[in-house]
C-alpha cells in the first residue's frame, strides 16, 4: 500500500468509517475516468476541488458530485474571502496528492472542507 493510500486508510479508520479503498490500474484523473473504472455513474464519484485564499494563502477544499462544477463566486461567498486557483505544487504540498487524485481525506495538513 502506498503512503498516500495508507494516509487515507488511517483517516478513515480514525473517523471509524469502514470503506473499501480501490487502487485503479489505469488513470482516473477525471470523475468520468473514475466512474468508468468502477462501473458507476459520474455523479456517484466525489470530486475534490481546491482553491487558495487570496488573502491568507490557505487552501480550501470543496467536495462535489463528479458531474458538478464548483462556482468560484459562490465558493468565495461561502468561505468569506476571495478565492483563487491553487496550483499543482500547492495542492501536492498541502494534501500529499497530485491534481486528479486528491482524496477527500488523508491530507498532509488540516484543510477546511465544504
Predicted regions and their residues:
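Extended, low-hydrophobicity, polar/charged segments
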Residues: 1-114
Amino acid at each position: 500500500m502506498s503512503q498516500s493510500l495508507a494516509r487515507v486508510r488511517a483517516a478513515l479508520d480514525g473517523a471509524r468509517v469502514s470503506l473499501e479503498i480501490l487502487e485503479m490500474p489505469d488513470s482516473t484523473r477525471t470523475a468520468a475516468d473514475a466512474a468508468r473504472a468502477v462501473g458507476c455513474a459520474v455523479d456517484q464519484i466525489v470530486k475534490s476541488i481546491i482553491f487558495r485564499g487570496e488573502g491568507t494563502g490557505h487552501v480550501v477544499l470543496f467536495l462535489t458530485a463528479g458531474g458538478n462544477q464548483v462556482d468560484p463566486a459562490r465558493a468565495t461567498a461561502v468561505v468569506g474571502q476571495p478565492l483563487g486557483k491553487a496550483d499543482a505544487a500547492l495542492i501536492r504540498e498541502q494534501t500529499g496528492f497530485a491534481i486528479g487524485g486528491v482524496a477527500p481525506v488523508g491530507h498532509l495538513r488540516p484543510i477546511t472542507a465544504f
